[in-house]
Curated annotation (Swiss-Prot):
Record bears the keyword Signal: no
Reaction it catalyzes: Zn(2+)(out) + ATP(in) + H2O(in) = Zn(2+)(in) + ADP(in) + phosphate(in) + H(+)(in)
PROSITE patterns in alphabetical order: ABC_TRANSPORTER_1, ABC_TRANSPORTER_2, ZNUC
General function of this protein: Part of the ABC transporter complex ZnuABC involved in zinc import. Responsible for energy coupling to the transport system.
Entry keyword Nucleotide-binding: yes
Homology family: Belongs to the ABC transporter superfamily. Zinc importer (TC 3.A.1.15.5) family.
Subcellular location: Cell inner membrane
Any single Pfam family the record assigns to this protein: ABC_tran
Subunit structure: The complex is composed of two ATP-binding proteins (ZnuC), two transmembrane proteins (ZnuB) and a solute-binding protein (ZnuA).
GO biological process, one term: response to zinc ion
UniProt-recorded name of the protein: Zinc import ATP-binding protein ZnuC
Length: 261
């Protein structure tokens, strides 16, 4: 197995008296793709913010594993980004504002080329389609050539065909950058086929495992075809408990398979 990049040890997070994350233990390795899934309010975005250091856990520890003499470099793509429509800004200018030190023109150009939108450098951010906007955010995340790329619901506002294209692009970025990828998905069952590990989250880690190939599911193949099945996969949950309407754990006397509403 590849060397670890980051380790989360018994992470708990509370906002006021409200538990958000409970007992999270997770190790992310070099060049690994980890997809985090779970219902709304499960703590997915909070977990990626803990991973990126945007918020500190209430208790527990995070270990960054140095890569030779280089510190861990994290690229982050947020779930949402709202721009003031009264303030026009071009794509290239938007990218120049990334990080404490403005990236060079050549770095911005290279990032846009890597995500396939070099032609949009002079476009206004407000005129972009949903898929184009997501690619700009992705370009921003890779400007510093991270060895850990964290993507919080990167497929928002993108149709199914656009999702497949983005999944292919993400796989290419892993190969080009040799980086690990942590990706949040709002879909409980459909994940990127190249995913090495799936974490099902509902405040705590409900289950953790490998996705099953979507090619085994004839109904999906009928809808989207074999080509789509190469880029998407289905994850089957295997829980020994369920959650009540408040998100609290309720145990099962026997092993139970279920879904979150």
């Amino acid at each position: 197995m590849a060397a670890p990049l980051i380790q989360l040890n018994n992470i708990h997070l509370r906002f006021s008296a409200e538990p958000v994350l409970e007992g999270i233990n997770l190790t992310i390795h070099q060049s690994e793709i980890v997809t985090i899934i779970g219902p709304n309010g499960a703590g997915k975005s909070s977990l990626v913010k803990v991973i990126t250091g945007l918020i500190a856990p209430t208790t527990g520890s995070i270990t960054h594993c140095a890569q030779g003499k280089q510190p861990l470099r994290i690229g982050y793509m947020p779930q949402t980004l709202h721009l003031d429509p009264s303030m026009p800004i071009k794509v290239s200018r938007f990218l120049s504002l990334a990080g404490p030190k403005a990236p060079s023109r050549s770095a911005r150009k290279a990032a846009l080329e890597q995500v396939g939108i070099a032609n949009l450098s002079s476009a206004q951010m407000h005129n972009l389609s949903g898929g184009e906007f997501q690619r700009v955010l992705l370009a921003r995340a890779i400007l510093q050539r991270p060895n850990l790329l964290v993507l919080d619901e990167p497929l928002q506002g993108v149709d199914v065909n656009g999702q497949i294209e983005l999944y292919r692009l993400i796989a290419e970025l892993r190969q080009q950058l040799q980086c690990a990828i942590v990706m949040v998905s709002h879909d409980l069952h459909l994940v990127m086929a190249q995913t090495d590990s799936v974490v099902c989250l509902n405040r705590h880690m409900c289950c953790h495992g490998q996705p099953e190939s979507v090619s085994k599911h004839p109904e999906y193949l009928k809808l989207f075809g074999k080509q789509a099945s190469d880029d998407l996969a289905v994850y089957t949950h295997n829980h020994d408990h369920h959650h009540d309407m408040h998100g609290d754990v309720v145990g099962c006397s026997d092993e139970c398979d279920h879904h979150h509403d």
